[in-house]
């Protein structure tokens, strides 16, 4: 067996890529900090029940599990930090007002989300708890766009959806849970033939307006005309009207900051835990979303304290492959002269100023120090910074 081999979709991050990821992380975290989001560091490993709180069966399948040798209970390696942040808000901070939290660390998946992705994403996210109004949805989405912008993502296409449109059709017509899940699966897969068969055979007693609305949902994808069609053809349920109003309000507010906004009223991603508006950000060069988010008001219920919540998360590894940040820094090569106090003082000042200074060790070949494009050279009794000669 070759001991240096890594499992599939697990990789080392080498210096240039690691530098780019770390630079983006600092830029994004600084953006979150100045908006009042407090940094938390949940554990990599905890009991499975906590990690699965408020999530669907998909999270259970994505999670690596081990038996705790101390308690005998099943533990999991986190596949998503959102439930952990919700646990911290609900059970540890336990405040009544608005709480803003952010996080940045690795998560681990049993299988990659996409064929081009890793099983160890570096997840960065922001969560806002304690406010149920559209204003907090707008704050989170604006913050996401600012984070993408400072990361070097220039062209952003935003998809907006709302879970309550589909859910209102289900609950307003009394559809049984087993049919709800079948309808959800058909819509999620965009399987219009299965959807048609369900509403005409399995649900033949369904109200005509609800039946037509369910069949229309996959077609409600596109620009702002989608909302006009939805208002015209969907049932006049109060929750549907409110959902469409929220989508319109957010789209108008965000329009100046994105290249394009698309509405998708059949987007049921995260249906098992999302409760309101959902969104996804895309950019050129990526066939999949670069950031996901939405409202999930019930997630804290599993920890004994349901709170309104909305947030987003993204994978810095994925983002780093799409950004135009490519300023891998060069350094200054200093000779090995431990007795030279003037040289030592100059090196110290350069490092304080943020410059990279590499001290060449005895026997080290300076030509191999490829990261350095300048030398410290003694000229006329003074140390000077000079370009590395050809």
Swiss-Prot record:
GO terms for molecular function: histidine-tRNA ligase activity. GO terms for biological process: histidyl-tRNA aminoacylation; L-histidine biosynthetic process. InterPro entries: aa-tRNA-synth_II/BPL/LPL (IPR045864), HisRS-like_core (IPR041715), HisRS/HisZ (IPR004516), HisZ (IPR004517). GO terms for cellular component: cytoplasm. Keywords: Amino-acid biosynthesis, Cytoplasm, Histidine biosynthesis. It holds the Pfam family tRNA-synt_His. This function is generally fulfilled by the C-terminal part of HisG, which is missing in some bacteria such as this one. Belongs to the class-II aminoacyl-tRNA synthetase family. HisZ subfamily. This is ATP phosphoribosyltransferase regulatory subunit. It comes from Nitrosomonas eutropha (strain DSM 101675 / C91 / Nm57). The lineage of its organism: Bacteria, Pseudomonadati, Pseudomonadota, Betaproteobacteria, Nitrosomonadales.
